[in-house]
């Protein structure tokens, strides 16, 4: 593989290193903020997915008898997570329901939240109006629910002007779903500073390790391109794109979510987001989603050792509700996908730029991404072959030597230690000064971060 420093792409932002937190999980527990820091997380989204359209922040309650953890107030979220973890915040305001739970969301309630956040440390940079309000699964008590015109008008005439009046410098966004039925109306009629898109690679029961690792991340890029096309058609080609939810399966997560396979998918997703110039992303979900074999896909065709799965990227402190038979694992323990974030945090630094990375030869299972790294170069290289190591030549155009090369690796062998409930982290090897190109051996099913100094 060859990196071309002259082929400069998008600016890199650490805001792609984001995760969701949910208001049903007690975020005041010791270890939550520390886990986010350990994984290199720089951005979070609150208060949840569909819960956002039933949640009322002033009373910390939800319509439709939704459960909210009493400790997980907005104030506690700021105090116990945001400040100690030093993360930037995106909030989804309630479009679906008013405080009386008998009509659509109230822009005044959203504006008061913006004002509260401004006076409370100004930690929230992004505000999205509603969650997946284009879908019938979402609470929407407007007279015409799940309707693009109703949504666009509500944003343009109510939410956007009132929220911007509360804080003119904040960013207010709308939800998008590529296609003429939603985006053409919303993007042409609403007011917005950014758009928010959600992506899940697979349907429950149809999970495939091969698809997830070999094709799913590239499918995300195709969808981002579709959003860009919709924005361009609306005359807003430069509008930032925020991928607010990411995952491998859109419901009933099984053992794939706790496996090395999802970690390798997540690492590629971060590479694709970086290459695409996405301004921000938050994976679903940091804590609060353990599930056992009674609900998700635990097929023997999927690789993994656990009798639990779930959206959580860190242990909730299992066993717990939803996976009562799981082997005990301390709260905050990094699961495989969190390790992918940890590795990528060595690459996704503000002020850097994407660089061209070309893979050639008989290495069909190898993927690579590259970015500047100070005066050096950072590569993220994947071996997607399950049983075979790959010897690859790594070169940088115009550079014949390096004063120091460091390689960080998370792979199948490290994950396999979890069969004994040992959740090992990445290894780091300092190779010292090297002539370029140099040959690296990539272990089976591995994500590798290679830092090449000048």
Where do the protein language model's features map onto the residues?
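N-terminal catalytic cores of secreted or lumenal carbohydrate-active enzymes
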Residues: 1-193
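Aromatic/acidic polysaccharide-binding cleft in carbohydrate-active enzymes
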Residues: 248-348, 352-367
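Noncatalytic carbohydrate-binding groove/subsite architecture in carbohydrate-active enzymes
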Residues: 110-113, 146-272, 276
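Conserved, mostly hydrophobic/aromatic
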Residues: 19, 40, 113, 127, ...
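Catalytic metal-binding/acid-base residues of hydrolase active sites
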Residues: 133-134, 178, 200, 247, ...
